[in-house]
């Protein structure tokens, strides 16, 4: 897209642009100020970039930005944004379709580095376009179901002005109904704020027009005689319309994926009063809207009102769908008649394909599957429209909470009452505060979006409260069973847990209704830190079985957003947690479970298949065994490998509010304190308390296998393992561990010990130490646990999945992948400030580039970015707008350390990512592209470490730290696996000892191979495979063969091919 051009040609382009802009401004009747600003912006961008394509298309982008910046004084309101030039007019004059506009506008915003507010405006505009497009595609078939086909009508004959009015045609009715809908939606934005409400508003408009067609004399010819909503006696000769207008809302909801309760609510409480208001204002007239004397006036009045709305408030004229040039102007194919020429059909097919491509890239209504979320998903559901998906999401949500109330159930109340301190009052108080804050912000109009009606806010809140109590009960029942009746006060008294859970339930409800209030809106209005919120996401997914695939993908993408960027903001609670832990960032080896690493230096093959489930048919969200022989009740299974108590662990109940998510001090530090301060220790008799039946009361801390290094008077050190409970008084009660029969040891009475008495420990006690070491090795836990460790465990997992995907696409060796991983871990552990206000992918891409450069296995920046863009989370803003400097001297401090050999240069993309240095927002910060960040900041911090892995420099190689272990991805659970929730069909791997088919076998590709290949295969089968005389390579054989050696040497290529096959299957 971006190429260098000679200066002379550039000057000619600018001159031509000036002429084209002048022509555009004259056609639009634009003011000189906006025109001059648009030309200046275009010239500035043209000086840094070579703009590909039509000049007028880029001018349209520049012109739109200039128009939105202009301020016009008004009589009543003071000022008005914009200059009364709609986007539709600009695009029509520039002959630019909306889809092309959104594509070019994103590039224009990146090149001109427009502020975030403007980007959000374009995103809202694009979403409005998508909602309108989706609804229009539903509008046509519904209209054809109710009324006659407007495209089969004979064309109107030309008539003079003096001729009498003629009745409205079906096409006129089609246009009027849509215009009435978009006008109502635009002026009644509290209803049209999401896809579900907008769709039900459309059904109300259709219901109104149907009622007028039935009630109006001699207008029943407009109706489709086969419509199921017609009165039972409609086809009789003596049919007469009733005095009360008929209502077909229920029929439309049944036939076209509507929600009856929602649609009736909008009709009765909002739509009918608004139509009455239009009659009062004389915008609508007559006893019947379709009457011969009033239809033309009504149509003109509604169109006039809507035009005023577009000029003053709106941006996007949604009547563009009705135009004859809709295909060219917006990309939405019109309903074609049966005699449409073949060429026209081809053009419409191309437009529809472009529209589909646009939606697939945007993925607003069907979120893409995050790389880390695929293990939670169920099987794919049948392909449905976005409207059906949205209404079904609401229906599914309502079915989840059916029969429940927004209050704790009897079972949950019993759990509350079993606590030492009943938390019900505090929970009610928290939920009340959240409800008030939510309703206030949901109904409040802002620059980002209009406020909704209080009834919608209350309805959403009630659904979320019911879901909250349902999930809370499931979590508490599971935790009670897992912990054998342990007191739940410590968890239930943590405000952050309840606030996070309620916020997650509200997000689920908002997503189900396709609300434009997208994440992180909910945590922003509730003032909830992302670093705390992410913990509850996996708990919700695992505990609520009724969540749809799209909902699970949405929640998982939220978790990824937090882990990759939101939790790393400068004001994040993460930095406080790091400060509490003495700024010791845990390594991957310290937080990942020991059995979750790849074995060997190169990694095992199994761990090299991140996205390859045992079967692409189903990704089970929760591990379930559905066989008769091994079925387990769901309510008896643990919610998560990491318990809720562990996620929300706090040292004591008393300090929970102050240190809710502070990193628990390591047990070694606690024991150091015990030794230096001479803490009193008590050993409890085995008859009174054991490690198995101990229960932790509020104010106590469990010490599990803690060790205390004690230096004796002779200078020798001994390690004494402890297993006990610490209380607020500073005393620790030691709990005896169960011993083998030959090592039986009994304590007759509690012995009071101090640290001084422990100094003289005898080496004769080594048997006890060995026994406890054996006991501790059976505990398969990470070296570091707690809130901070959980966060970094998920961060490392997310980064490893993305890096693995990149390496597979770029055919990177396992050795280089581990070096990249080691470098990435180094930046997180030793340079955590590099992540502040930045994105995880930025460090990952830089680590990839520098290690490939050092090891001479170079991949160009263009190759890396091409593979990165194919990842579902990829966004151009990640590599085009990177924080360079928020604190003075940060860049300068490391400029001197840069070596030209490591400078990131890519001719194809260097210009593409060139961003003007400017400040965005009140915080002083300089932003640039990823290349500039790499060259000015990253290399200076990482170069000395990366050079240690330079194979050409043996001196550096001697200092190279060992490569960090790389996490492997757990494969999907074993067979048999259910492939459908509707049918009892299971699959298992084929247990066959025979060998694989040699690669030299015949291959036939459907729609690609000649028929001769198929004939050869058939002949071979008829002959009993006589021609397969070659040696078969057994998959389970241990014998080494040349074929096997070749396969192992090229395992990355083979794995990539397998990966492509799985991806293709998953996408179909």
Curated annotation (Swiss-Prot):
Looking at the record, which segments are called Domain A? 385-584
Segments carrying the region annotation (Spacer) are: 585-780
Mind listing the GO molecular function terms for this protein? Answer: promoter-specific chromatin binding; RNA polymerase II transcription regulatory region sequence-specific DNA binding
Q: Can you summarize the PTM annotation of this record?
A: Cell-cycle arrest properties are inactivated by phosphorylation on Thr-332, Ser-640, Ser-964 and Ser-975 by CDK4.
**Where does the chain cross the membrane?**
none
**Record carries keyword Repressor:** yes
Tell where it localizes: Nucleus
Q: Where is this region: Pocket?
A: 385-949
- Describe the subunit structure: Component of the DREAM complex (also named LINC complex) at least composed of E2F4, E2F5, LIN9, LIN37, LIN52, LIN54, MYBL1, MYBL2, RBL1, RBL2, RBBP4, TFDP1 and TFDP2. The complex exists in quiescent cells where it represses cell cycle-dependent genes. It dissociates in S phase when LIN9, LIN37, LIN52 and LIN54 form a subcomplex that binds to MYBL2. Interacts with AATF. Interacts with KDM5A. Interacts with KMT5B and KMT5C. Interacts with USP4. Interacts with RBBP9. (Microbial infection) Interacts with SV40 and JC virus large T antigens. Large T antigen, but not E1A, binds only to the unphosphorylated form.
Family classification: Belongs to the retinoblastoma protein (RB) family.
- State the name under which the record lists this protein: Retinoblastoma-like protein 1
